[in-house]
Amino acid sequence: IWKGLVGSEMCIRDRPIAAASVAQVHKGILKDGSKVAIKVLRPNIEQTLFRDFKFFYGICNVLEFFSTNCKRLSLKEIIATFAHSSLDEIDLRLEASNSEQLSENFVDYELFDTPKIYWEYTTKKLLTSEFIDGVRIDEINNLKTNISVKNLTTVASEIFFYQTFRDGFFHGDLHPGNIFINQSGKIIAIDFGLSLIHISEPTRPFH
């Protein structure tokens, strides 16, 4: 689908605008003029992860053989949890679904949203979403003068508490690089790979 899109359905910039360990993001423009962000998995990332986790398991076996303290730490369980999360991260359909779920949870809240997902251009290895023209939340000096930083702080706090106590479904990686403010002052969250955390209703008051 990646090769088929180029030239036929959208124009894509060669140079990525962001890059991380498992994927990189390119800016593109659809035939109708819509600006999009295209997240693409790195080649052979699944095989690389399996190889790395196999290596870590081997190290754990050695450590546990020579040290009872290491065995008590349950290192294999920690690695298994991390492996499960990492494999979820490399299925970009899950990230797209997480983004839409969070958007639906705030459908009646005008000051928060997530980028629109273009499912017709999204697969396990490719995620196409609305490109966000905005300012990172830590770059407040670049915000328009009519946007109140105090109000943004209040809204951000409300968003966090709604996610935690009302929905039990929240973005757990809200660092400044994943939070943008658009021209109207709305908070837009991006990047939902590892970050969506589900909290069962009975335990929400304890988080």
Go through each PLM region and give its residues:
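AlphaC helix of the protein kinase catalytic domain
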Residues: 137-145
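Conserved ATP-binding subdomain of kinase catalytic cores across diverse folds
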Residues: 8-9, 13-135
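Single conserved hydrophobic/aromatic residue that forms the stacking wall/gate
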Residues: 1-7, 12, 197-207
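The start of beta-strands in P-loop NTPase/AAA+ ATPase cores
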Residues: 34, 125, 168-170, 177, ...
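Catalytic activation segment of kinase domains across protein kinase-like and atypical kinase folds
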Residues: 176-200, 204
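Conserved kinase catalytic-core segment
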Residues: 147-182, 192
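Feature representing long, continuous alpha-helical segments
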Residues: 126, 135, 150, 154-158, ...
